[in-house]
Amino acid sequence: MRILGIDPGYGIVGYGVVEKLGNKIAYVSHGAIKTEKGEHFEDRLDYIYNQVNEIIEKYNPELVAIESLYFYKNVKTAIYVGEARGVILLAIKHSNIPFVEFTPHQVKLTVTGYGRAEKTQIQKVMKILLKLNEIPKPDDAADALAIAWCAAVSGSDYSSYKKNTK
């Protein structure tokens, strides 16, 4: 099963793709969608939406795993991330692919064994788990790989998930 992990944001959206074959999880790809600070916010959202669609089309995942929103001290940041997450979920919906959500705590606990792990720890662990030559960068992409990994090892049978309907 091919799984696309997404770490939502409005400045940088991380993505990571893994393939689960039996009990093995193989690395496929990772990267980041970066938006320009000076652009109008609606243009940034449009760009994120289009890029997520392209990633879905390119990697053809059977499942998307996305990080759920967590508490932000800055309300404005939380709203922006929530809006970016909304267009990402819309792209997933239009692609007719099932998705699952994980909290940052769940992902960190699953990947490192510690629910409050630092981003650098996530990067190092993902390098080891996926047998990569280098630490995955940016850290948003490493987080996305960790989200995909979390879906792959969670033990759920996602093949029985009902696909989104258009």
Swiss-Prot record:
Function per UniProt = The RuvA-RuvB-RuvC complex processes Holliday junction (HJ) DNA during genetic recombination and DNA repair. Endonuclease that resolves HJ intermediates. Cleaves cruciform DNA by making single-stranded nicks across the HJ at symmetrical positions within the homologous arms, yielding a 5'-phosphate and a 3'-hydroxyl group; requires a central core of homology in the junction. The consensus cleavage sequence is 5'-(A/T)TT(C/G)-3'. Cleavage occurs on the 3'-side of the TT dinucleotide at the point of strand exchange.
Q: Which domain of life is it from?
A: Bacteria
Which reaction(s) does the protein catalyse, per the Swiss-Prot or TrEMBL entry? Endonucleolytic cleavage at a junction such as a reciprocal single-stranded crossover between two homologous DNA duplexes (Holliday junction)
Name one molecular function that GO assigns to this entry.
Answer: DNA binding
Name the UniProt record assigns to this protein: Crossover junction endodeoxyribonuclease RuvC
Taxonomic placement:
Bacteria, Thermotogati, Thermotogota, Thermotogae, Thermotogales
Main localization of the protein described in the UniProt heading: cytoplasm
How is this protein organized at the quaternary level?
Answer: Homodimer which binds Holliday junction (HJ) DNA. The HJ becomes 2-fold symmetrical on binding to RuvC with unstacked arms; it has a different conformation from HJ DNA in complex with RuvA. In the full resolvosome a probable DNA-RuvA(4)-RuvB(12)-RuvC(2) complex forms which resolves the HJ.
Protein's organism: Fervidobacterium nodosum (strain ATCC 35602 / DSM 5306 / Rt17-B1)
List of catalytic residues: 7, 67, 140
